[in-house]
Amino acid sequence: MKRITVTKFGLLSGGLMFAGGLIFAGGTQDDNPPRVAQVVALDECDPVTFNAALGPDFCKNVTIGAFTKLTDLFAKAQAGTPDPGWDFEPDTLHIQKGTDLVVVDQGGEPHTFTEVAQFGGGFLPVLNAPGEETIPECAGGFSNVAVARTRILQGSQDHITGLSKGEHLFQCCIHPWMRVKVEVK
């Protein structure tokens, strides 16, 4: 009985040493761990005016002492000078093929992160620059499932994987001046 236990212990120890050797030799480690790049959605919505017009808790202001009233946001967009407090950061991103994008909404209201063929107007004409039409990828707003899938809510994130080599353009279909160009090498 004692001999069987010693034999089993020896086999177990040998197996563990072999497995440990594989790990240190890289036999079970991923030689190319996934790469991640982050894009952050920002805004400065004023909870009082946004929530009065759009419903309770639509805007959860996250800025300290800086906010934009809903009417001011509309006026700036209509004048062709959209509010710079609504932004994707960075504006341009250079990544390697296989890199995952993590898009985080650190603003106070929802956004979309929609891939588009070319930049243009979103689905809310009041927020489009003068003469700017809604682009096909944003048409229909959230009733279009393709647009709804790209929505990111306050405090949430989305993961974009499998981008091919080349240039990829993303914009918010609500606030169309929020734009990012991603170059995949």
Language-model regions: role of each:
Residues L22, G26-K185:
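Extracytoplasmic copper-binding redox domains, predominantly the cupredoxin/blue-copper superfamily
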Residues G10-G21:
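Bacterial N-terminal signal peptides
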Residues M1-V6:
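N-terminal secretory signal peptides that target proteins for export/translocation
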Residues F9-G10, D87:
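Hydrophobic alpha-helical segments and their boundary regions
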